């Protein structure tokens, strides 16, 4: 049994992780064997995501100052592991969805991304979203296409203007 000081320290540490992360995901892992759990942790680690098993009571203590503490606390039943996403808040959803296809013991409970809470039924939508990096790349591509098309549009306008002037000149003769 953990001492009270140790519990307080862990709750404080988890609270800091909640604040530092752009998003966090609660999962239930009951029934996953050690090998599968290690494989899942490795997938998360490759993506720069911290995955940690935490007691529900410690999570509740860590969330006591959160805006949606009631919604988040409602999902804390059975065993809980938390995936903390510091860089890409969508990456855990993709990993959880992919991993849970082959491992039904892993269940998505809920997530909080930039302060918005998502329930257990929202994993498919979350996993289909583009990451911030992918969105920036698409935006950069769109802007690049727009900038590249400006000279073409200007040339077309000039050609049309010259053509109109030429036609007007022919009509006057």
Swiss-Prot record:
- One Pfam family recorded for the sequence: Ribosomal_L10
Keywords on this record? Ribonucleoprotein, Ribosomal protein, RNA-binding, rRNA-binding
A GO cellular component term found in this entry reads: large ribosomal subunit
Question: Where would one find coiled-coil regions in this protein?
Answer: none
A single Gene Ontology biological process assigned to it is: translation
Q: Does the keyword Oxidoreductase apply?
A: no
Question: One MF term from GO for this chain?
Answer: large ribosomal subunit rRNA binding
Q: Which domain of life is it from?
A: Bacteria
- Give the protein name, as stated in the record: Large ribosomal subunit protein uL10
Natural source organism: Chlorobaculum tepidum (strain ATCC 49652 / DSM 12025 / NBRC 103806 / TLS)
């Amino acid at each position: 049994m953990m001492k009270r000081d140790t519990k307080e320290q862990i709750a404080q540490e988890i609270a800091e992780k909640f604040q530092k992360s752009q998003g966090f995901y609660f999962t239930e892992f009951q029934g996953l064997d050690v090998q599968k759990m290690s494989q899942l942790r490795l997938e998360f680690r490759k993506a720069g995501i911290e995955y940690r098993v935490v007691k529900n009571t410690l999570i509740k203590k860590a969330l006591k100052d959160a805006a949606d503490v009631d919604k988040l606390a409602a999902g804390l039943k059975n065993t809980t592991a938390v995936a903390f996403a510091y860089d890409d808040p969508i990456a855990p959803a993709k990993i959880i969805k992919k991993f849970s296809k082959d491992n039904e013991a892993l269940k998505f409970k809920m997530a909080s991304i930039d302060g918005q809470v998502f329930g257990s039924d929202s994993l498919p939508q979350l996993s289909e979203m583009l990451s911030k990096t992918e969105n920036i790349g698409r935006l950069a591509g769109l802007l690049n296409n727009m900038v590249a098309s400006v000279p073409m549009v200007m040339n077309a306008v000039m050609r049309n203007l010259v053509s109109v002037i030429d036609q007007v000149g022919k009509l006057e003769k």
